[in-house]
């Protein structure tokens, strides 16, 4: 019976092979390690037992090529254990391999008398080994891969109809670690024929993506792993971003990242980089493709990165490679002169040929010549040009302060961006003129010869340029306090004058000007002198001892009076305060820079030109929008000014469709910022006004606004770090105060923080009008600003001073120490105003040092003259930083007993009837037993509790102690108010 079965299986196998064998093409992602059909001659695999088990059979395919197969069909006997082992298979670096088995299997039901012994499955095993010296099959060494079952089995009918049912099964094996392995097939009683066995591993084949080549890569050790592979740029290309891809377990490349770019002089073609053709160029690797040489240039070789200019044509250093080559301009045309005494006006027409460039400008050369017009020399610095001498964009200029009756030659040169590269070309036109008689120049000095009680005798030198015969001098004088509203004139033919009829001990301002036949010159600058108090000449040589003694005695008395007044004023406040009236008088010390309000300029654009640097828009690269401001978008980007390194900047843009007023208001902030130069004031890089959009360029602050930054980093900084931030803000505000600038909107949201935690004051563009609505804030063009940062006198009377900025600084201190908490929490603006008016102030934030909260309270003094100056604030913060121990003491106690503290966690006294009510309202019910056990059964006892008491009754958490004590303080304050014992500040 067994022989019959073997014969049936063999005949069926022969017919099958004729249909399925032949040359096969495998996917590129599969690398074959073993293919039984490609072996020439016998396979020679080891079988166990050697006889009566697996049998090697050779059959012919349709091309009469022998194919070696193995078959077994011991279905008549039970307990079969027939093993077949392949030769040693090297794994070739693969960590996971795949076994493809093609086989046929006889249906047990089609064989009579084998129901108890016939099987329809077989087992697949593997064994790893570093060599091929295994001669025997040691079953215990092998690891089972799987039990293989047929999807289809054949019967006797199929054999008769020559229908053979071939099964294909694939199993993966791994991870593998040794040099190679064996496969083994275990038959347990099936009628089976192994038609072919193929072992392979998968790889991601060599490929080129985004100009990067990725090599053949073997897949990972498991079916879900991804192998990261770094690509290498193809020839003549460079990395833009590191090229990477992932090799999937199925041999497919996934997720391409990064790319390469063809080098300058090369462009992409069919997955590679080819050189630019003759007549074409590519300047940068980031350019997409080669471009044809621009006009007046050529490229004679392949792979050019730029084109050479034709003879006589040039390219400026700042010109892009895509710009046509250009020439210097021809000379200006039609130069016309107009002489007006010692001034000359010149006008001309543009050059006939601009050289092909739009950047034509004009330089003016002035020469003073002798009578024969042969000996000429430069005019010197005394001559003035309007609008300027060099870099003129207009075709007219005025030359002033020339000498009278003098010959001058003026040359007008036309230049453009390539003029320096061809200095030999004549680009100028000239004209010679003779000036007329002119008025004299300004008197530069006035000196007092004698000063008495009612008169001043003056003398002065002749003007530097008389420009003719001086006919007379005119002296204008007035009292200092009159500011030229009422003045008198005295005329004299000499260089001196006696001014009489003056008031004693009064300051007078004097101006002098000279007159010739051509008219009056300009008045001199102001010179101030004060009359005496006693009828005597100036103290000097020849003064009597008596007069000298009286003068000295009077001076001593005056000094004593001033010292006494100073001491009295010092006693009024520990901060050396002086009563600040509604209109504060600004004392401008010599050498101290003072803020100039740009809105006082008749032409606001003049303020922008004076205080802000104009930047070429081509130097700016906008990268992304980071916010929306009052006038348009706020962006981040880069600024690269020629000759300087590239820096990150913030860019404010003016939205399209703006009005003249909006443009003026937008640029006013730049006019203000441009006057400031301090490490704690936001730095203005410049403006763009000559093209759209109009932009303000400032330094870039990486960490954004201080309030948001603190909220994002709640609790991460030490007290010293927070005080350092406050010190920086205070230093910036001291600088502004010293310049007589009042900020008006100092708040944490208007402080910017850079990557080094340096805080800088910003937002100088606000104009505010206080509305009558108590719930309103200062109305601006972009919205409303909450009044909870604003001093009470500024709210009530619009009194904005440095002292009101100090109040705002105190609120900023509170914001910093509370990590960006909203001042006064969710109270309405009307309630805030009312509470402040009644003497209430913000309590110390959690863990805030007492010294810092005391400084806050000093900043919040109702009388603005009692508040510290910014210089004193900075000095105090410096002392705290130098003495860190002074910052360790925290608590809720307060030396100002008449200042009630606000606390949102304190329940209303009227709503609390017992200790339990208070604990529930304050969310501290967990400590009910602690208070009860310690004997705190009434609210009258609770309001006297302190930190030691809380520790004693078992409440040890510092944060819980602070919050409970804060609530107790609020309860105590409300109780005092109800009993009439508290007097608001």
Swiss-Prot record:
Residues in the Cytoplasmic compartment per record: 570-985
Tissue and organ expression note: Localized expression in a subset of neural crest and neural tissues in embryos.
Positions of transmembrane segments: 548-569
Phosphotyrosine modifications at: 595, 601, 778, 927
Record PROSITE patterns: EGF_2 (PS01186), EPH_LBD (PS51550), FN3 (PS50853), PROTEIN_KINASE_ATP (PS00107), PROTEIN_KINASE_DOM (PS50011), PROTEIN_KINASE_TYR (PS00109), RECEPTOR_TYR_KIN_V_1 (PS00790), RECEPTOR_TYR_KIN_V_2 (PS00791)
Function field: Receptor tyrosine kinase which binds membrane-bound ephrin family ligands residing on adjacent cells, leading to contact-dependent bidirectional signaling into neighboring cells. The signaling pathway downstream of the receptor is referred to as forward signaling while the signaling pathway downstream of the ephrin ligand is referred to as reverse signaling. Highly promiscuous, it has the unique property among Eph receptors to bind and to be physiologically activated by both GPI-anchored ephrin-A and transmembrane ephrin-B ligands including EFNA1 and EFNB3.
Protein's recorded name: Ephrin type-A receptor 4-B
Source species of the chain: Xenopus laevis (African clawed frog)
Taxonomic lineage from the root: Eukaryota, Metazoa, Chordata, Craniata, Vertebrata
GN (gene name): epha4-b
């Amino acid at each position: 019976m067994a022989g019959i079965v073997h014969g049936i299986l063999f005949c069926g196998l022969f017919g099958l092979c004729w249909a399925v064998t032949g040359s096969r093409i495998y996917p590129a992602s599969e690398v074959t390690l073993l293919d039984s059909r490609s072996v020439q001659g016998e396979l020679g695999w080891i079988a166990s037992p050697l006889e009566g088990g697996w049998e090697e059979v050779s059959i012919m395919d349709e091309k009469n090529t022998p194919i070696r197969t193995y078959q077994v069909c011991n279905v008549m006997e039970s307990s079969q254990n027939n093993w077949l082992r392949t030769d040693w298979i090297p794994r070739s670096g693969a960590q996971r391999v795949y076994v493809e088995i093609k086989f046929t299997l006889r249906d047990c039901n089609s064989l009579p008398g084998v129901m108890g012994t016939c099987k329809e499955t077989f087992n697949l095993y593997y064994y790893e080994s570093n060599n091929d010296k295994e001669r025997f099959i040691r079953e215990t060494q092998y690891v089972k891969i799987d039990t293989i079952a047929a999807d289809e089995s054949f019967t006797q009918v199929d054999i008769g109809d020559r229908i053979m049912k071939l099964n294909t099964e694939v199993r993966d094996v791994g991870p593998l670690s040794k040099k190679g392995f064996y496969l083994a097939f275990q038959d347990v009683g099936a009628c089976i024929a192994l038609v072919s066995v193929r072992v392979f591993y998968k790889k991601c084949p060599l490929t080129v993506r985004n100009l990067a080549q990725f090599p053949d890569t073997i897949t990972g050790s498991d079916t879900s792993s991804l192998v990261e592979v770094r690509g290498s740029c193809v020839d003549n290309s460079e990395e833009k971003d590191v090229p990477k891809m992932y090799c999937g377990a199925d041999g497919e490349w996934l997720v391409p990242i990064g790319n390469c770019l063809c080098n300058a002089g090369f462009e992409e073609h069919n997955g590679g980089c080819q050189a630019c053709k003759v007549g074409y160029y590519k300047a940068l690797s980031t350019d997409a493709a080669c471009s044809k040489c621009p006009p007046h240039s050529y490229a004679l070789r392949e792979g050019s990165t730029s084109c050479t200019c034709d003879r006589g044509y040039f390219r400026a250093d700042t010109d892009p490679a895509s710009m046509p080559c250009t020439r210097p301009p021809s000379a200006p045309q039609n130069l016309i002169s107009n002489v007006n005494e010692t001034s000359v006006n010149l006008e001309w027409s543009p050059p006939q040929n601009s050289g092909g460039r739009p950047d034509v400008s004009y330089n003016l050369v002035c020469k003073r010549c002798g009578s024969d017009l042969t000996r000429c020399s430069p005019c010197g610095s005394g001559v003035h040009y309007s609008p300027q001498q060099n870099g003129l964009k207009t075709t007219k200029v005025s030359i002033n302060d020339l000498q009278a009756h003098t010959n001058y030659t003026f040359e007008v040169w036309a230049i453009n961006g390539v003029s320096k590269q061809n200095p030999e070309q004549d680009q100028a036109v000239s004209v010679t003129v003779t000036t007329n008689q002119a008025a004299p120049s300004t008197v530069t000095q006035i000196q007092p010869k004698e000063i008495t009680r009612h008169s001043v005798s003056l003398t002065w030198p002749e003007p530097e340029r008389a420009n003719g015969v001086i006919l007379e001098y005119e002296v204008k004088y007035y009292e200092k306090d009159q500011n030229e509203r009422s003045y008198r004139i005295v005329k004299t033919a000499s260089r001196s004058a006696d001014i009489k009829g003056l008031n004693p001990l009064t300051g007078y301002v004097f101006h002098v000007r000279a007159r010739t036949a051509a008219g009056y010159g300009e008045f001199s600058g102001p010179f101030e002198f004060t009359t005496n108090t006693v009828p005597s000449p100036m103290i000097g040589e020849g003064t009597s001892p008596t007069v000298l003694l009286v003068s000295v005695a009077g001076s001593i008395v005056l000094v004593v009076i001033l010292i006494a007044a100073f001491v009295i004023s010092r006693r009024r406040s520990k901060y050396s305060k002086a009563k600040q009236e509604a209109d504060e008088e600004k004392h401008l010390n010599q050498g101290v820079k003072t803020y100039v309000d740009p809105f006082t300029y008749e032409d606001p654009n003049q303020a922008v030109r004076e205080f802000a640097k104009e930047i070429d828009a081509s130097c700016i690269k906008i990268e992304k929008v980071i916010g929306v401001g009052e006038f348009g978008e706020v962006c981040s980007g880069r600024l690269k000014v020629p000759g300087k390194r590239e820096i990150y900047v913030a860019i404010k843009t003016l939205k399209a469709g703006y009005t003249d007023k909006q443009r003026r208001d937008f640029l006013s902030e730049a006019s203000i910022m441009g006057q400031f130069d301090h490490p704690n004031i936001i730095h203005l890089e410049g403006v763009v006004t000559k093209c759209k959009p109009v932009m303000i360029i400032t330094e870039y602050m990486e960490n954004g606004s201080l309030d948001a930054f603190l909220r994002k980093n709640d609790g991460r900084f030490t007290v010293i770090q927070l005080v350092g931030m406050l010190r920086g803000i205070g230093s910036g505000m001291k600088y502004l105060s010293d310049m007589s600038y009042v900020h008006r909107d100092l708040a944490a949201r208007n402080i910017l923080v850079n990557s080094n935690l340096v805080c800088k004051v910003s937002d100088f563009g606000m104009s505010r009008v206080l509305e009558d609505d108590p719930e309103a804030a200062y109305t601006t063009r972009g919205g409303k600003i909450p009044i909870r940062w604003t001093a009470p006198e500024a709210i009530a009377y619009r009194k904005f001073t440095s002292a009101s900025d100090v109040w705002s600084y105190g609120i900023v201190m509170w914001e910093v120490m509370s990590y960006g908490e909203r001042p006064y929490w969710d109270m309405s603006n009307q309630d805030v105003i009312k509470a402040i008016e009644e003497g209430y102030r913000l309590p110390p934030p959690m863990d805030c040092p007492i010294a810092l909260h005391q400084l806050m309270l000093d900043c919040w003094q109702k009388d603005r003259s009692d508040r510290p100056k910014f210089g004193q604030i900075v000095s105090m913060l410096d002392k705290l930083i130098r003495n860190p121990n002074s910052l360790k003491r925290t608590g809720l106690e307060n030396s100002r007993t008449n200042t009630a503290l606000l606390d949102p966690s304190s329940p209303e006294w009227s709503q609390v009837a017992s200790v339990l009510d208070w604990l529930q309202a304050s969310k501290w019910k967990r400590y009910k037993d602690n208070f009860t056990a310690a004997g705190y059964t009434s609210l009258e006892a609770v309001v006297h509790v302190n930190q030691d008491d809380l520790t004693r009754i078992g409440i040890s958490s510092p944060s819980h102690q602070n919050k409970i004590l804060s609530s107790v303080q609020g309860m105590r304050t409300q109780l005092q108010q109800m009993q009439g014992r508290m007097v608001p500040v």
